[in-house]
Amino acid sequence: MGPDDLINDLSTFGLFFETLCVRDLRVYADALGGSVCHFRDRKGLECDAVVHLRNGKYGLIEVKLGGDKLIEEGAGNLVTLESKIDTDKMKAPSFKMVLTGVGKYAYQRPQDGVYVVPIGCLRD
């Protein structure tokens, strides 16, 4: 498999991109004394990355290559997951984020509070 194959197979390219993003998140979380894990419940609801810090705070992250449809899908998934969290037993997430492969600027969606962040913005 070469670069041309990946360009023509966005599904596989997306999996590679997700893996690289999770690797970067692990580096950043480790620098803060935190960790990163994956979440999936028995009904198939999942979150690509959950960043946990030692103080008990955590964030939910979906990784998407980009595009309005995929960003909307990722944000919807995060909102659904947050609604299933029993905040009597654990804290609500500190943030929800869709990490994308495109874009120059990060922003917060006013309708649901989900941050949309291009991967390049994490370094700053």
Where are the predicted features?
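A cross-kingdom feature that marks ATP-driven nucleic-acid transaction machinery
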Residues: 1-124
